[in-house]
Amino acid sequence: MEVKGQLISSPTFTAPAALFGEAAPLVKSDRLRGLLDRQRALQEALSVKLQELRKVCLQEAELTGQLPPECPLEPGERPQLVRRRPPAARAYPPPHPNPAHHSLCPAEELALEALEREVSVQQQIAAAARRLALAPDLNGEQRRRRRQVQVDALRRLHELEEQLRDFRARLGLPVLQPLPLSAGALVNAQGVCLGTRLAQLSQEDVVLHSESSSLSESGASHDNEEPHSCFPLTERPSPPKAWDQFRAVSGGSPERRAPWKPPPSDIYGDLKSRRNSVASPTSPTRSLPRSASSFEGRSVPATPVLTRGSGPRLCKPEGLHSRQWSGSQDSQMGFPRPDPASDRASLFAARTRRSNSSEALLVDRAAAGGAGSPPAPLAPPAAGPPVCKSSEVLYERPQPVPSFSSRTTGPPDPPRAARPSSAAPASRGAPRLPTVCGDFLLDYPLDRGLPRGSGGAGWGELLPAPEVPGPLSRRDGLLAMLPGPPPIYAADGSSPLLRSKDPNTRAIRSKPSGLPPEAVEGLEVHPNPLLWMPPPTRIPPAGERGGHKNLALEGLRDWYIRNSGLAVGPQRRPMLPHVGPTHTPFLHARCYEVGQSLYGPPSQAPLPHSRSFTAPPVSGRYGGAFTDG
């Protein structure tokens, strides 16, 4: 049981005692004693609080002169009369003599105080600038700069004081004279005003500047005369250059800057350095990444890197789609350009890349033209270094003994000391008959790299219908499809294949023999009639085009087998029993003649079929296309 926060425990209050009234007087006395004690404590606390409130009210009455009604009074007590205490003496600013000053609004007073504060700060800045300008051990340049800083500080102070005077005059306040600084920068002992001092400093600065400029023009300066200098002679910054001169030196933006061109000795230098280098920096095309074989000692022939990126091209068939063209080997050559110099630069950049087996595929092919018209020859290269200097395939001086080497199917590589380089330039001796390029991709379909168009003469117009073949490859001997003599050599002994290499020879246009006069008339003959063929009249379907890709891979595998030493010697390709006659007598004779000129004397057998390719030979697969209907 709880009574005003007090608990009555069981010993003091029990049910039988409450019921029967046996202990009632004792319980009542205890409860009354507790309540009285509590009342006495509360009364004491209340009296203390009332005394505090009384003091506060009396203090308020002394300030206001009136006793507040909240002041506690004893019963029957009258309100006390309290006299107002006089106010304490406080330090107030002296009243301004002008009565208009008391009528300023708070905004005007704040603006006036801010302007006066700014003037005071600027006075301190001017005094510090004067002390720095008068410091000893200063050379001419430092003294001139500090004088200039002092003049600027004084000019700013003069402007602020003018603003303060105008503002006070507008408010009707008396204009105050500028207070003198401790160092006497504004008003010195003689009473020189600010304007006079500012004019003197400006005149001194002009005189000092003219003296320094005259000394710099005559070749002398204050820095050479005084021992204390800001910068040593070797560390002083160079004078600023004109903007036009800076643009002429820097070349402007990187897009307009002329590309860096290495000297000819670096471009046509050592074959080893060219083998490990990327494309020439003057090449507008992208450089090809180097294969991993260059870091392995080239024990295994490098895999040709085929790019599908876009870039300038020298020749591209018109009817061939750009995506299909970008996948071919000739996509690394580029489109034709009207400028012969740009064609030569692009061709050189494309042929100075990694010298792999794909470099042998970079032959001059058709540019723009009709379906049957042979492509126009490229512009003759200008005089200069040879355009094509491959380190593996093409050489200007082959060995006279035709034999198979470890890298090409043509003549063996000349020794490294005999190869053309910048250290030992090639001497122009008696003209020799150079051999044709080796390492042809024999099963690469010819219709991929030939132009297609709507107009012009095709095979159907140049050959009889039974002799028109289907989609064939170079392995079938169709390099000599058109009748005519073997490759025509120029008077100086240069080959049509290597004509673009020699800068001193001009491209010789020859008419293909064996054609009718009306077919020959008006045709632009390719520089190499042996490698050019009109396109087939039948476009192979998608399935055969996929087979042509397999044939291209087969040619690459043949190249690997020949160069890795797996093939002991040339073997004759076996004839399958179910295959009929391969070629007509005309085609057989021409193929034999071309094979003899390309791969050696008749005693040697043609190139072997790939050992890793399980399909029948190409001649067997396309045997029906060569037979007379």
Curated annotation (Swiss-Prot):
Pfam families: CUPID (PF11819)
Modification type Omega-N-methylarginine: residues: 432
Any one annotated GO CC term: centriole
Gene: Ccdc120
Source organism superkingdom: Eukaryota
Descriptive protein name: Coiled-coil domain-containing protein 120
Keywords assigned: Cell projection, Coiled coil, Cytoplasm, Cytoskeleton, Developmental protein, Endosome, Methylation, Phosphoprotein, Ubl conjugation
Any one GO BP annotation for this protein: microtubule anchoring at centrosome
Keyword Ribonucleoprotein recorded: no
The organism's taxonomic lineage, starting at the top: Eukaryota, Metazoa, Chordata, Craniata, Vertebrata
UniProt region (Involved in CYTH2-binding), positions on chain: 31-70
Coiled coil residues, start to end: 109-173
Chain intervals for the UniProt region annotation (Disordered): 209-356, 399-432, 602-629
Transmembrane segments: none
Complex and partners: Interacts with NIN and CEP170; leading to recruit them to centrosomes. Interacts with CYTH2; this interaction is direct and stabilizes CCDC120, possibly by preventing ubiquitination.
Localization: Cytoplasm, Cytoskeleton, Microtubule organizing center, Centrosome, Centriole; Cytoplasm; Cell projection, Neuron projection; Cell projection, Growth cone
Main location class: cytoplasm
